[in-house]
Each structure stands twice: as structure tokens, then as C-alpha cells.
Amino acid sequence: HGFRYVKISNLYEAPNPASVKAYLIHTDFELNSGFECSDTDLNRIHDMVFYTLQCLGLGGYLVDCPQIERLGYGGDGNASTVTAQTMFNLAPLYSNWLDAWSDVIREDGSMPHTAPNPYSAGGGPYWCGFIISASWHTYQNYGDISVLEKYYPVMQKWLGYVEKYSVDGLLKRWP
């Protein structure tokens, strides 16, 4: 659930706890696939992942906990993109989120760890590299080559920045 406490006000008497209802608010993502097998534990794991992902896209990009978090972390996106895009048609969500990543690249090619990004904090390669992995997975899952074409200049600029911190193809200490 996305709340810890509920305050009910302006009542003349306390309600019967059984009469209080909470409603699930979630994004109505189009289902891309389903899963069911003979192992009830695997089915329950799938259902928990499904429920979680369904509730994490309320702001137009995936977050780790929508009741608290308002930023789309690249690391969280990297951890969940393959599963999320397999379960749901998230092409519109990723189009929006990749636009946000495109908007936050800095003049020197560095990127923050979230998009949108309301402050100056930076991020490591796993977070910033989301512009590449999300573009690639979105193309692979939905077959839209324009995603790669649109974000290729941003990817190039970021990789140019990464190159400044690489020796023989390996990253050295990240700034």
C-alpha cells in the first residue's frame, strides 16, 4: 500500500473499521503479456511484480515508491525496464521518460541520476547510462527505430563524457 495512516474527519461517530475502504489507484497500462504456471509460488511472485509495476508509473515514468518518490532514477529504470516492458506496453511512458533524460544532459555531456532532475546532483554510469539502455530496450520491445534515431545524439554526447573517464576502455574513478 502507498500509505501508512488514514485520517477520516468530519464524522459524527467513529466508523466501523470493516466499512472503511481503500481504493487502488494505478496507471492503466496496456497488458503486453501474461504468466501462469503450475507453481503457486511463481504465480504469486509474478502477481506481486505485476502489481508493483502497475503502481509505479503514476507520474509518467517509473519510480520506486510513488507515495514518497517523485523522481525517475536511471538505476531503478535499468533494474526494471526489461520486466516492465515485457509485462506492459510502456512505449508512451518510455517516450516521455526518454524525453526527460534528453532534457537533463549537461553541456559537458554529464547527466544526473534522475530525470526529471530538479537539482544539480550527478550520477554514476548505471544511472546515467539509462539513456542508452532504455532507448535500446524500447526499440527491441516495440520495434520503433525512431527511438534510437531521436536519442542517438544524446547517447553520443554522454559517451563522449564517459570516454574522458576511461582508460583502455575501462572506467576510472567516476567524478
Located regions from the model:
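Substrate-binding groove/exosite segments of carbohydrate-active enzymes
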Residues: H1-K7, L11-P175
